Amino acid sequence: MDFSIKGCDWSKGSAKGFLTGKSDCIVLGVFEAQTLSGAALDIDEAAKGLVSRVIKAGDIDGKLGKTLFLHEVSGIGASRVLLVGLGKQDAFSQKAYNDAVKAAWRALLGTKVVQVTFTLAQLPVPERASDWGVRAAILALRNETYKFTQMKSKPDASAPALKRIVFSVDPADEKAAKIAAKQAVALANGMDLTRDLGNLPGNVCTPTYLANTAKKLAKDWGLKADVLGLKQIQALKMSSFLSVAKGSVEPPQFIVLHYQGAAAKAAPVVLVGKGITFDSGGISLKPGEGMDEMKYDMCGAGSVLGTIRAVAEMGLKINVVAIVPTCENMPAGNANKPGDIVTSMKGLTIEVLNTDAEGRLILCDALTYAERFKPAAVIDVATLTGACIIALGHHNTGLFSKDDALAGELLDASREAGDPAWRLPLDDEYQDQLKSNFADLANIGGRPAGSVTAACFLSRFAENYPWAHLDIAGTAWKSGAAKGATGRPVPLLAQFLIDRAGA
């Protein structure tokens, strides 16, 4: 799809080009109480009051998400007008904007419209300018058009008719909106990669598949890729990671991707993604119902790869390192057993009380490995705990950090990106739950505050740099009829890096 930006001040009569320009459809907003948006007023005047008459006749009442097509409207160049209900004007919000935009795209995608003029980005969203509206609209469109059919015998290769979208924006926002459009496309491409990796079955998206994906990213985007195999992982004494991997016939991989957008001496931001390509629970076997969704236990890895792809496409002036420890967690005669004690790369011994708490066992060695980069910050991303779903549901990602400044940056990025996160506690008192009679610490801390104690475990291996942990167990994928990977938290991570890069 092609996206272009044009400045237009509807209040100053500069909309002639939009009124007379040829397109298949122009999209206008209508508030409840028969109130037209600025663009709709101009179109209504050019059409000699047709829009007003349609509203007064009750064909569209302005309720949020309602849509109505008008055909062959005189006085304008577009062959159709799409009216979109915006709800109550005094209650118009970011969520209302997103809902209206989603309704518009769904209506348009059900037609053979090829070129659209889109005016909704200029709507008065509190604390937002046109550039934000453009970015949100592009991401919404890409989300609506995403489909995963690669594994079907007859994949759906059809593309939507919609090819060209012209956004009208406030003239003062035109430059920023062009940047926002490019960032949105890069971000959507990164999210699509994350979703594709998550949606692939575990017999396809293996650790080796993830490693090959990283190598392809390096080739396509000028990154440096280091993929460490079993012997190299053993040489690094990552025995905690290997204790999880040994129960599977699939060989483990330790992936390191480097993106250099700043001076070589500049400290990088390191992203660490959990890459359990299938999690059976190991000897502490999970229930059979819903176990198919454990292919999504590598969504942390997928989001890290998707983020670095987006960063490379944006060309951000920042250095980023992506680390992915990846393996399967399977039951076998040589698999981890409850009560086993393993030694981490850091040297701390860990009593494995539950083999289904394996994510922290692979992440702890990756967090130790990250020290060699002398990072500006380290953020790990993992589908780590069901307890986080109990605490936060499926809307907010769990955020843990002892660094208030870093946590604040991530929360700001989450709000800007519309990819919400919620900070949870990481008090030292919770560490007591991880005490072991036989090792330096246990890999679980009991049922109370399960997501907190998991983060506390990781914090023991992240003491030498600013660190944050994102628990995406509730936000990385959806179940039910809409089952599939979401692409989160790529928007949050990318926005954090955009902000860090000053882009």
Curated annotation (Swiss-Prot):
Q: What is its EC number?
A: 3.4.11.1, 3.4.11.10
Catalyses which reaction?
Release of an N-terminal amino acid, Xaa-|-Yaa-, in which Xaa is preferably Leu, but may be other amino acids including Pro although not Arg or Lys, and Yaa may be Pro. Amino acid amides and methyl esters are also readily hydrolyzed, but rates on arylamides are exceedingly low; Release of an N-terminal amino acid, preferentially leucine, but not glutamic or aspartic acids
Q: CDD domains, per this entry?
A: Peptidase_M17 (cd00433)
Names of required cofactors: Mn(2+)
Q: Which InterPro entries match?
A: Leucine_aapep/pepB, Macro_dom-like, Peptidase_M17_C, Peptidase_M17_leu_NH2_pept, Peptidase_M17_N
Entry note: cofactor: Binds 2 manganese ions per subunit.
The record's keywords, sorted A to Z, are: Aminopeptidase, Cytoplasm, Hydrolase, Manganese, Metal-binding, Protease
**Which EC class heads this enzyme's classification?**
hydrolase
Localization annotation: Cytoplasm
- Binding sites annotated in the UniProt record for Mn(2+) 1: 279, 356, 358
Binding of Mn(2+) 2, residues:
274, 279, 297, 358
Among SUPFAM superfamilies, the record links this protein to: Macro domain-like, Zn-dependent exopeptidases
User: Which sites are catalytic?
Assistant: 286, 360
CC terms in the record's Gene Ontology section: cytoplasm
Q: Name one GO molecular function term.
A: manganese ion binding
Q: Which GO terms describe its biological process?
A: proteolysis
What family does the database annotate? Belongs to the peptidase M17 family.
Q: Which PANTHER family match?
A: CYTOSOL AMINOPEPTIDASE, LEUCINE AMINOPEPTIDASE-RELATED
The task this protein performs is described as:
Presumably involved in the processing and regular turnover of intracellular proteins. Catalyzes the removal of unsubstituted N-terminal amino acids from various peptides.
User: Can you say what this protein is called?
Assistant: Probable cytosol aminopeptidase
**Which organism is the protein's source?**
Burkholderia thailandensis (strain ATCC 700388 / DSM 13276 / CCUG 48851 / CIP 106301 / E264)
Give the taxonomic lineage as stored in the record: Bacteria, Pseudomonadati, Pseudomonadota, Betaproteobacteria, Burkholderiales
